[in-house]
Amino acid sequence: MTRLLRHFLVFASCALGISMASAQMRAQMRVLVDQVGYETKAPKVGLISAAPTDHPAQFTLIEDETGKVVFTGAPQAEGKVDRWGDRVYWKADFSSFQTPGHYILRIADGDTSALSCAFQIDDNLLERKTLSNVIFYFKGQRASGALDRADSHLKLPDGPGAVDVHGGWYDATGDYGIHFSQLNLTSYFNNQQVPLVAWTLLAGYDTLKARNDDNFSEYERRMLDEGLFGADFLVRMKRPQGSFFQSIDGPGVKKLPQDRKIGDLNWKLTVKTKADQLNEKEPPAEGPHSHEVSFRSGGGVAIAALALASTMPEDGDFPRARYLQAAEEAFAFLQAHNRELLNDHAENILDDYCALLAATELYGATHKQSYLLAADQRADSLMARLTTRDAFRDYWRADNGTRPFFHPSDAGLPVVSLVRYATVASAANRKKTLDAVKRSLEFELATTREVNNPFGYARQLVRMGNGDVRTAFFFPHDTEAAPWWQGENARIASLAAAARMAAPLYGDDPSFQSALQNYAEDQLHWILGRNPFDSSMLIGSGHGNIPYMFFRSYKYTSAPGAVINGITAGLNDEDGIAYNEGFAQTGKDDDWRWAEEWLPHAAWYLYAVSLPHR
């Protein structure tokens, strides 16, 4: 086969996947791979999506440049995934092949064959091929122009005067607001947004620096610059004698500069049926600190980011001492007043892990014993939430009862905060922490393996709207956040980060270490195209990127380096699967659930990819 013909067939195969990504599953045999590629020494598995009548007998790994067959194997049957349609999956395992290069997988079933998209095998592949784009994405999301100028003199929400809060990053493809967090009224689903971006950039900078690879040097320079840009914004959002403003809203159909304002905490989503509809709001928050964040609504991670920024090798627009001052003042305020800022006035697991990260970073920046004591207390509170009930052993308890913690974007943050804490804890507390982390991650691994799951997608323990507790692939549609639900690429990337952070700590258990590395890689493979829809969800990488449409308009276009929301449960089946079933199918503004880019997805992806791995 000539290279030109081979490339035409590969292109046609991928283009077919692009055009049909919203179909439930294709009838023809498909070869699903990580469309960027695989680490040289890591497991390398392609998945074959086949009809029940298909019985692929052989797979071959073909060198893209020459057409030479370099590896041959027999696919292993993996079976169906319950309620994901009638597709049967087969595994093509070529893990033992470790020669860097560009390759294609070919699957044969009698006279029928199928080709994968081309992919690469190399060391530090995702760092090399994707990290730069993600950093550029954040720079492209910086507030600028007329909107940024408006943000430099926004009216104070609770009195006369104006405040300069320019800077920050626009939240999503179609949202030019700038948010610390959202979903306040849900109690359990506050997501970490702009502060998370700042923290992951700076923590990722430290991580890459510690890996001591000159190939990363320019990434480090740009991550430091971007992280300090975020820290500068957090300083501007800091309220004197208080916490931080939570949000800058960019409301209105035309998103005009003059409409921008400090955001109300009590935001509620409306699923629109017309483009000119606006989101609903509950009665506005009231009180002297009504527009300020709690630990769980962005304050804890903002403090962590500012404390970490104060340890960087250079200043941003503000000196490093100012970063630390803002962090210490906000921490002192929230230690005294956090419950007053909560919608239900009751702390839960989100407050624990956000405050733990804040205290840990403050101790790292200052070595003040008061911060280590605060971190010890929050770590103890968090670890006490490991709970066993019925068949569910060592899950995180979200409240003071038995409600499981599950989260659409930050599921890995309890472990991330504990592993970060373990670096400063006493020997006794470190031992206790590593035991808790292992128990938690063993639960995650067991839940993921509980059912047939050839993709290794991170499953979760959830609480349905009727109170039933069960395991599931995807975030339920009937939680306190309803009608808000969307794809979970941030969730699985946060779990990949948690697993990669934890893995080096368990050198005495190679099997557990390997399981964590596999688990992390499986989540990244899913994002990069090894999923049932053959769609890379990192814009500009791989194939099958789906466009974000707003009522049939493409005016909001996702940026290269962005990670979109991703795959969800079925529209009418919590155990089903759906992707890109928007306005054209539902008659509602549902496209964002799958196709919209969002800061937390890229933030967690960047951090996971920055971490050392095998």
What are the roles of these predicted feature ranges?
Residues 199, 203-205, 209, 217-257, ...:
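Transcriptional activation interfaces
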Residues 35-111, 139-195, 204, 250-309, ...:
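Aromatic (Trp/Tyr) and acidic
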Residues 122-150, 226-242, 324-342, 373-394, ...:
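Long, well-ordered core segments of solenoidal/helical folds
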Residues 203-229, 283-290, 308-326:
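Short coil/linker segments at helix-helix boundaries
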Residues 1-5:
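N-terminal secretory signal peptides that target proteins for export/translocation
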Residues 110-119:
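Short Trp-Ser/Thr-centered turn/loop motifs at beta-strand boundaries
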Residues 21-23, 27:
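Boundary at the C-terminal end of the N-terminal hydrophobic targeting segment
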Residues 7-19:
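Bacterial N-terminal signal peptides
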